[in-house]
């Protein structure tokens, strides 16, 4: 399961970074993906340390994490 989670976060990072650069509705899509995946505060915190998210995505993740 660890490998799956790492792969999921790698894909999410690429997807979210690209989406944030091209879409005005990126926030809604990112939140829906996170809701659907059932991510936890710990997962977000850990991945903010290891992944290279764009600034806008970091802000979205921090906001999402605060609401969990």
Where does each model-flagged region fall?
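N-terminal acidic leader/helix
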Residues: 2-27
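Short, charge-rich amphipathic interface segments used for partner binding and complex assembly
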Residues: 21-67
